[in-house]
Curated annotation (Swiss-Prot):
This is Presporeless protein A. Functions autonomously, very early in the prespore pathway, to control prespore cell differentiation, maybe at the level of transcription. Also required for proper aggregation. The gene is pslA. Keywords: Nucleus, Sporulation. Residues 393-403 have a biased composition (Basic and acidic residues).
Amino acid sequence: MGRMKVIPEFSNYKIRTPIPIFKNELEIEKYIKGAISYIYSENTAKKLELKKRNDEIKEILNNKNDHEFVEKKIRAIVIQLGDTNLNDRCYLNYLNLYKQPIEFTHGAIMCEKNKYWVAYYASQSLNLDCLNFIIKHKDQFKGLDKDKRIKPIDPKKKISRDLLIGQPITVQCIKEDDLFKFLTVYFNQNGIEFSDSWFSSIVKLIFKGKVYSSDESEKLSTTTTTTTTPNEKYDKKILGEHTVFINKNRDGHLKFSTIPSLLLKISTLMNTGVINEYKQKNYFLETLYNSFPANKHFFNFNEETIQYITNLLLPHLHPLEFKRFNTIPWIIKSKEFIDFIIQHKDFYHLVPSIHKFTKKHENTNLFSASTINDGEEEDDDDDDNDVDGNDDDNNKEKVDDTSNKKDSIVKFKDDITIYLNVRQRFLQFSNFELANYFHTKLLECQKESENQINSNIQSINKEIESLSTSSTNTASSTRSKASSNSNQLKKKEDLEQQIIELQSLLKNKYFSNKEIYYLSFLRALKDCDISTIESIDKVVSIDSDQNNNKFQILFQKSFLENQPLKNGISPEFYDFKKVGPSSHPDVYAEGEYDEHDEYDDYQGKLDNHIDIKDSKFTKDENSRDQLFNYLKSSGFKSFTPSIFCYLLELLLLINTEKSNQQFQEIFKPISTTTTTSTTTTTTTTNLDNINEKIFKLSSDLLIHLVHIVDFKKFSIILDSVNLNRKLILEMIDNCKNKLSFQKRIYEFHDVRSKDYQYDINGHFSTNIKFSDAKDILKKLIDENLFPTSKDWIFIYHSLYISILQSTGVTLNNLLEVNKIYEEHEINYPSVLPNHSNYILDFNNNNNNNNNNNYYGLLNYQPYNNSGNINNESLKNVVSNFVLFYWFHLLDRKLSKLFVRSFSNSNFNEFSSSRLPCLKNSSICRIRSKRHSNTASQIFKSIYELQNFSLLEKYSTFKSYFPEERSYYYNNPSDPFYHPDGSKDFRVLIEEGEFQLAFNHLQLVATKTVSEFPPLTTSRLFQFITLEDVIELINLTTIKNFDESKDESEQQPLLKMWYGKDVKKCKDWILSCAIAKSRLDIVDLLLVKDIEYSTLPSTIEFLTGYKIIKSLFSPECDNQTLEYFLTFSNGIVLPSIKQYLIKDNIATQTKNDVFRVIRHGIGKFELLRTFIPSLGFSSCLIEKMVENRRFETLQYYMEIGLITNEDLTNQQKDQLKYENDLKHLDWVINLNHKKRVNRNQPTFTPNTNSTTATTATPLLQTRSGRTIIPIKK
């Protein structure tokens, strides 16, 4: 929070102090002083008036208890100032000070903006006087929120301290009756509508306990006066810790006595139309919904309060209102909340995600035989019974009353239903901890229910026995005996029937924990945990018939149907009719959800729940081998194809020769179980249910492998399975309806997208051999595995991409592949849609008779028939697909291929204009350093195309633009790119995080780079300590060199930049230290480090351009410059003189020196004491004249830096013309505001003075820039 701007007389006053409740007169006095001085300090011109108003201020302070007098005085001051912003501040300040609005008569004061601030203040503070003022003038406030000129304040953002004069609005307590009186009068059909800030404020105030009922005010002995300022006793209780009115009742619950009634009253207002717009209702409900569980006493609400809030929210729930599960993240994190929901069954309907499971089972018997699991699930190690369950009063009931017994059983059934639903929800969202927790609760509940049922059976058996004994000792009358016997017999039959029903319940298992085993099994695969797999295998492989194995069926259902592949997302994933929002009717109403919304919303939820990026399966090859050996052994009984389908998916994420071999070992056993038969009309598959799923998965895997261009595994599938092409085509058709398939291909090839990287090292695989890719292409075409029609073109597109990236590819190879594509009329892939009218030719000439609409990728001649360059065609088509992949992969070989296909003259002709989005050419410079000249040439050419649509179409390119840093720091192909996406090591060095930087550098120890970060981007030496520099140097020094060890193991980390030479690292540190005037670091290197400072190469470096540039940096002070002018008998002087005096110095040097002169002439004057002959070279004078810096030139002549002899006749004429023009401006008094400040006195240089004084007047150039002259 910022400080209030005050003048020195009142600087001791801290405006942050909460003022509204004044404890003594001194506080009032301080406040009035601070407020008034703040008003005047806003404007420099107004400060003068403050002295005139000292008498008025004294008068105000003398009469500070007379509110009417103070109001009149402040009103007069504000009106006279006449500044709208000041009016707003003063007005709101006065509201906050005296808690009552001022009815200003001046028109400017009661402007629309001020009306809004009054309303805002009233909503935030609920100040009754302010509310009454609004009611009194409600006509003025009508339609306030609809006025487009008034931008309402976002209640989530803090109001500017300037606007509130640094005053936090203190919320008062308000009586419930007063609040609703205001609400009903102010917000009616003819009044002002609710705004968002009102909704937010009222709900927050209610939950903070700021609204109290009349009963409570009487208990607290509060007086109901016209002002609502609380007394001291009331203040302690109400304004203390937000624990107002929270009194513990007998049950130990905290009782919120005001919240339920207040919320119900607001609900009534909503229902009666006072709050009549859906948007406002929605905002209010969402605020309430989100505020309620955030309250720290939430879990201690009693049932009465819960029922109130349930009744309030339920009528207003809309199907779309809380559709996303992640809008209520607290539900998934809190066991207590779930327990709470279970205890209050009415309340859990508020959570649609849980409610859906209840709806799903409303019309089905959860306890039917279909849910019985004959396995011994209780034996699983994961399901411990040591968690204490809830203490249920029903468990302690006596068993005498049959109805009570039945009720207790029904209660257990209800509890089990809820536990099932909640556990299932956590399983679906992969929260294993809570899923196991509620599974344990489920077991406890089942155990309790079994005990209760056994108890009931025993009591019924006793009752039957008592009936049997009583029948022998009953009445003597035959009639009565007969009737008694018949009654007893009927009762006995009823009891026996009850026992049968209870025993049937006892046989049933009220839960199914197959999901627990399934998820535990997948987790064990990920962790290569063979012992867990063994324990699960003992439980689930009871049924020897594979087709009826419930665990296997569950596997197929959960994985093959509902769980898309993690990295190769099957087209089925995009078919939302199957797995998307429409399967949740309680969350999404039919036809009321947005397609893109679904994709974003469900992608994460439906993704495979086993993330193996950092798993043992991925990283430890030995553990993976042991796991495979066990799974293939006879010891593993649950050898099912579905398990190995999952392993196939895991292996997709690993790209090594070993993983390819394991992939083949797994896939072939699956393929041997498939049998296919074909008919003349359609291709049919005669497979059982399991193999049909495997068959379908094969299709999914194939599509995935095409996407990631992994043609080794692709070839394995082609060799092993007769694919159901019709099925694949159907999936693609389904996918096309929902999301562009072509766009997905490009997404999968985005190497910088973390979601789709599949290589174990986090790099995109480009090790496909050209021969392998070509063989697969021939196999696809020769065996007609996939037709070359439009539906299957994506496979050939991806294959072409892999050929472009393959190792060993040459231009002739590509032309050979192009010929195959042409012969079979296969279209080439293209990034640009709807440009099929451009016909490209591979024979370096335009064939107008060629009507095949395809994109040529290499030998495109950008000329039209007249011989002129065809710019329009070039901009749209210029081999952009190759550019796209070269751009992403930054493949030097591929760039050369592309460049060779164009002549240099062609490049020069179409590279005349630059792309507007490029701020400078730093990218091209960097690329030229990092890659070959041909790569730099193509890179430059890409950006010089004005309408290169990829730049607009793919947001990923934005990171390549030179913003604060270039793509250099955010590029996967960069040798120092961090695989996990964290900061680049050069950024870490600039921030002084040396150890982190060098830890990172170890990851790329095999890479090299040619230079340190450029000086201009290094912020390292601004705040760095000397100890840090020593650490940086020590980290680059070899320690304990051992000749017996491999030299590469002992190289310091930074030597990867410069091999074994640490000197350049110190050179870099030295140049940066000079530029930042860090003489302590310079002393460390040049005085204490004798070994470095005495090297001939160091002396040579000190006289080089880098040091000269550092000495002339704006942050290098005169002391540092003088140090180097005298260092080692002035060895730097000659090089400085050479750079400053010679006229033929480089343009860059001219610019550097000129920039230094602009920033301050002090360094130049210091140099003149060491180089008496030093004067301005003609090139620098020429630079000043060229940039029209005539005032600067005149000033340098006045102080003697430049003489008339230094100027040419033309320059003298130009200077004379400028002086004449300047004099003419003075005479005619032209209105050139940006010219020399006429109020400044004429400056006459004092040549005798050696230092600049603070009294030196400022000079202004014609452009308005101020120059601070520094005298000799």
